[in-house]
Curated annotation (Swiss-Prot):
GO terms for cellular component: membrane. GO terms for biological process: protein ubiquitination. This is RING-H2 finger protein ATL75. It catalyses: S-ubiquitinyl-[E2 ubiquitin-conjugating enzyme]-L-cysteine + [acceptor protein]-L-lysine = [E2 ubiquitin-conjugating enzyme]-L-cysteine + N(6)-ubiquitinyl-[acceptor protein]-L-lysine. Its EC number is 2.3.2.27. The chain crosses the membrane at residues 60-80. Belongs to the RING-type zinc finger family. ATL subfamily. It is a single-pass membrane protein. Pathway: Protein modification; protein ubiquitination. It comes from the Eukaryota. The lineage of its organism: Eukaryota, Viridiplantae, Streptophyta, Embryophyta, Tracheophyta.
Amino acid sequence: MAANELASSSVQAFQEQSLGGFVSRKLLLHNPFDHNTQRAFAVAPSPLITHENNLSGNVLMLLSVLICGIICCLGLHYIIRCAFRRTSSFMISEPIAGLSTPCGSSNKGINKKALRMFPVVSYSPEMNLPGLGEECVICLSDFVSGEQIRMLPKCHHGFHVRCIDKWLQQHLTCPKCRHCLVETCQKILGDFSQADQVAATPTASVIVRIAPLEPEGRVNILRESS
């Protein structure tokens, strides 16, 4: 009996020792610190990839800001140009008070016959005419090479033919300097009327009567008898 009890106690002690060693080896194999370290190395991104991502994000943000700025500048420029055009049109069309000339009181435009006598030139950037600028102040558009420009007398300011013709249908002044064109138109129309009068005056007819010649024989007889 004693031998059996000793053998069973020895087997039990051996089993407990074996189980303890197994558990300790298992704990060594499954070290939580090593697992966390491996996970950290596996999850942590590369510094180079992070830098490239940050750089791409900065470039996209910078491009977005530049595009938005350009769009805002273009929109603001368009709004200012439209406002300036409206203001200029209003100032040009506003009648001038206190003028003693007929230009201040007449709403009738220039006679078409006189208007057609104003010179028209073909615009070229190389032209150096006094008073001719680079844009039409009526439509606020730059002159283009080959466009027909009508020049006003006296002030020599130039405008698009379609713009100045429409303007002078209702006004008698230059839209840029307000020079009155009534006197010039009257002079042109006066020259026209004088030319018409000269053309309409009938020329005096001169009647020349030629007497028939007498026969030569009769003349000789008359001379002998005398």
